[in-house]
Amino acid sequence: MTLLVGLGNPTLRYAHTRHNAGFDILDSLVSELDLSFTFSSKHNAYLCVYKDFILLKPQTYMNLSGESVLSAKNFYKPKELLIVHDDLDLPLGVVRFKKGGGNGGHNGLKSIDLLCSNSYYRLRVGISKGIDVIEHVLSKFHKNEEPLKNAVFEHAKNALKFFIESHDFNAMQNRFTLKKPLIIES
């Protein structure tokens, strides 16, 4: 079993902000698979079970994401953990994968690292860096960024679909890494 976590902040106030990239990508995946999330008060998260994957969207706010992840991890005992999250150190249009390592100042990852360790897989989606970090991550994408954001989120969703079928992180990493921003043709 694999625990697949999309990071974000709950409530409509934060819907579709840069920091909610993980939520948006998991929502798109679940929608395409014609499934739905149900709320689990036990884990304070929305859950969706598909094959041998538990998809999880913590409802604790970003800085406490580790609480939901730890609860689900202790209950389901997954063999693997994959976190889908925004990364402001990567330009918009870039997707990278990583196993373990530092949290890059990402408070959701800090919370998970503190409670669960940092030896998990990551799907990192670039959101670019703004002048004011907090204002930037909590802002929505600009209208001129939408086509690129949509293409990158679609790419990340396809990477997750591939991972669900293959169970092969290295193959997903090799096939779906975008080291340079995705080029959108008009």
Curated annotation (Swiss-Prot):
Active site residues according to the UniProt entry: H19 (proton acceptor)
Reaction equations catalysed: an N-acyl-L-alpha-aminoacyl-tRNA + H2O = an N-acyl-L-amino acid + a tRNA + H(+)
Sites marked Discriminates between blocked and unblocked aminoacyl-tRNA: N9
InterPro entries recorded: Pept_tRNA_hydro (IPR001328), Pept_tRNA_hydro_CS (IPR018171), Pept_tRNA_hydro_sf (IPR036416)
Compartments in which it is found: Cytoplasm
EC number: 3.1.1.29
GO terms for MF: peptidyl-tRNA hydrolase activity; tRNA binding
Annotated binding of tRNA, by residue: Y14, Y61, N63, N107
Single GO BP term: rescue of stalled ribosome
A GO cellular component entry from the record: cytoplasm
Subunit field text: Monomer.
Protein name in UniProt: Peptidyl-tRNA hydrolase
Species annotation: Helicobacter pylori (strain P12)
